[in-house]
Amino acid sequence: MGQKINPHGFRLGITTDWKSRWYADKQYADYVKEDVAIRRLLATGLERAGIAKVEIERTRDRVRVDIHTARPGIVIGRRGTEADRIRADLEKLTGKQVQLNILEVKNPEAEAQLVAQGVAEQLSNRVAFRRAMRKAIQSAMRQPNVKGIRVQCSGRLGGAEMSRSEFYREGRVPLHTLRADIDYGLYEAKTTFGRIGVKVWIYKGDIVGGKRELAAAGVEAGRGAPDRPRRERPAGTRPRRSGSSGTTATSTEAGRAAAETPASDGASAPSAETTES
């Protein structure tokens, strides 16, 4: 199952978060359609900007759009003209006030979406697919936070009559481990032989203490009773022993005194009442 499913959807709520964050009842379908239109608008108008992901948050009268890009200068434009144009297009599309945030991706070689887009651009420029895949893998494995990568190309590779899929992998990519931080990207290259799909999986280590694990740990801690402090036993005393009628006399002061007094052969040891008197 982990080999086929989208890694982001497979780990939602465990190690990954939703890219659209809002609540709706009757307008749910309209909001989903609107989110798809927003992402499509940004993808078609900013192909060369290197957009890694788009996050959308909604309030009652405002929409916040966060664009994570490797080239923020292209998105902002000269004196912010491009950003103003994008904001105007989004406000026209949504009919609400739009807050546009442009965030720079610090390490584009470790972002799966940007790696897939880079391989697809090379395929469109008639670069050999094996060379493009190996070059992307070498660049990604140089990053300190990348533990493994897998790149797959599907389509009429090299102009072959029959389409096929080929992939290269380096390092470790545990797709079925839920705590694994797997970044996934998909992009399509438009070539003269048709479209070639490029998929990239990047493994960045394990996330210990995900959302569900932390929540479960909090619930278990709330259920358990608080530990009571243990009292120190005075030196030279014996632990109490339970008898048929409660505590024996050896656990009391009188019992200890009677135990320490040596008894004669013909006389029995004095009882607790005799010692007290």
Curated annotation (Swiss-Prot):
Belongs to the universal ribosomal protein uS3 family. Residues 225-235 have a biased composition (Basic and acidic residues). The gene is rpsC. Keywords: Ribonucleoprotein, Ribosomal protein, RNA-binding, rRNA-binding. The keyword Transmembrane helix does not apply. SMART domains: KH. GO terms for biological process: translation. This is Small ribosomal subunit protein uS3. Residues 38-106 form the KH type-2 domain. Gene3D superfamilies: 3.30.300.20, Ribosomal protein S3, C-terminal domain (3.30.1140.32). The lineage of its organism: Bacteria, Bacillati, Actinomycetota, Actinomycetes, Mycobacteriales. Residues 242-261 have a biased composition (Low complexity). GO terms for molecular function: mRNA binding; rRNA binding; structural constituent of ribosome. Binds the lower part of the 30S subunit head. Binds mRNA in the 70S ribosome, positioning it for translation. The keyword Ribonucleoprotein applies. It holds the Pfam family KH_2. Part of the 30S ribosomal subunit. Forms a tight complex with proteins S10 and S14. One of its GO terms (cellular component) is cytosolic small ribosomal subunit. InterPro entries: KH_dom (IPR004087), KH_dom-like_a/b (IPR015946), KH_dom_type_2 (IPR004044), KH_sf_prok-type (IPR009019), Ribosomal_S3_C_sf (IPR036419), Ribosomal_uS3_bac-typ (IPR005704), Ribosomal_uS3_C (IPR001351), Ribosomal_uS3_CS (IPR018280). Residues 217-277 are annotated as: Disordered. It comes from Mycobacteroides abscessus (strain ATCC 19977 / DSM 44196 / CCUG 20993 / CIP 104536 / JCM 13569 / NCTC 13031 / TMC 1543 / L948) (Mycobacterium abscessus).
